[in-house]
């Protein structure tokens, strides 16, 4: 039987494009792990995607996942649009490259490793975990906001095409999933 994990994700951006951050909460068997990261120049949609990708990639083995996002972009993309994009060689219906295509491909790969049920939650509506994921996203963005930018060492890029977050933090990690 695969491990059952609950994930809550959010992305944030100051300006669009501008400095941005993402946050994720992973909950398994009474243990909570919080992740966050950010980029100096990005969009809110990229941060929403990176939150989901980073959370799913943090799982060490295939799991049954309930993933909660407040992003209609991520929900529609993963549940509706992605099938056509893949069929069309990662092109839209009008033959243009999919925006954030490298991130969609990374999310597709991460999604296929697990049994994921995707859930949409209304953002900024008092949903406790979504509010915390938003706080984590803002924390991830903070080092890149004007006046507080401190260059961080880049994490090694496992996929040269995939833009990895420059800074990633994990908190309250007592067990690897």
UniProtKB/Swiss-Prot annotation:
| Stretches assigned to the RNase H type-1 domain | 1-142
Q: Which reaction does it catalyse?
A: Endonucleolytic cleavage to 5'-phosphomonoester
Which GO molecular function annotations are given, in alphabetical order?
Answer: magnesium ion binding; nucleic acid binding; RNA-DNA hybrid ribonuclease activity
Q: Where does the protein end up?
A: Cytoplasm
**What superkingdom does the record give?**
Bacteria
The GO cellular component terms are: cytoplasm
In this chain, composition skew of type Basic and acidic residues spans 126-138
The entry's Mg(2+) 1-binding residues are 10, 48, 70
Q: Which PROSITE patterns match?
A: RNASE_H_1 (PS50879)
- Record key words, sorted: Cytoplasm, Endonuclease, Hydrolase, Magnesium, Metal-binding, Nuclease
Q: Which cofactor does it need?
A: Mg(2+)
Q: How is the cofactor bound?
A: Binds 1 Mg(2+) ion per subunit. May bind a second metal ion at a regulatory site, or after substrate binding.
Q: Which GO terms describe its biological process?
A: DNA replication, removal of RNA primer
Bridged cysteine pairs (disulfide): none
Question: What class does this enzyme belong to in the EC scheme?
Answer: hydrolase
- Pfam families, per the entry: RNase_H
**Region of interest (Disordered), residue spans:** 126-177
Q: What is its EC number?
A: 3.1.26.4
Residues bound to Mg(2+) 2 are 10, 134
Q: State the similarity comment.
A: Belongs to the RNase H family.
Q: Subunit structure, briefly?
A: Monomer.
Q: Which NCBIfam families match?
A: PRK00203.1
Please give the function described in this protein's UniProt entry.
Endonuclease that specifically degrades the RNA of RNA-DNA hybrids.
What name appears for this protein in its UniProt entry?
Ribonuclease H
What species does this protein belong to? Mesorhizobium japonicum (strain LMG 29417 / CECT 9101 / MAFF 303099)
- Protein encoded by which gene: rnhA
């Amino acid at each position: 039987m695969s491990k059952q994990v609950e994930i809550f994700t959010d992305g944030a951006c100051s300006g669009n494009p501008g400095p941005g951050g993402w946050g994720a909460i992973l909950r398994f068997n009474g243990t909570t792990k919080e992740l966050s990261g950010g980029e100096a120049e990005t969009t809110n949609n990229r941060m929403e995607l990176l939150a989901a990708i980073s959370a799913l990639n943090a799982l060490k083995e295939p799991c049954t996942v309930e993933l909660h996002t407040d992003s209609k972009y991520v929900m529609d993309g993963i549940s509706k649009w992605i099938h056509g994009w893949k069929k069309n060689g990662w092109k839209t219906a009008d033959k243009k490259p999919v925006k954030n295509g490298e991130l969609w491909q990374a999310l597709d790969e991460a999604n296929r490793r697990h049994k994921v049920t995707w859930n949409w939650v209304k953002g900024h509506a008092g949903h406790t975990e979504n509010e915390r994921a938003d706080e984590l996203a803002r924390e991830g963005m903070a080092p890149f906001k004007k006046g507080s930018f401190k260059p961080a060492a880049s994490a090694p890029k496992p996929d040269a095409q995939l833009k990895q977050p420059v800074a990633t933090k994990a908190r309250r990690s007592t067990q690897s999933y």
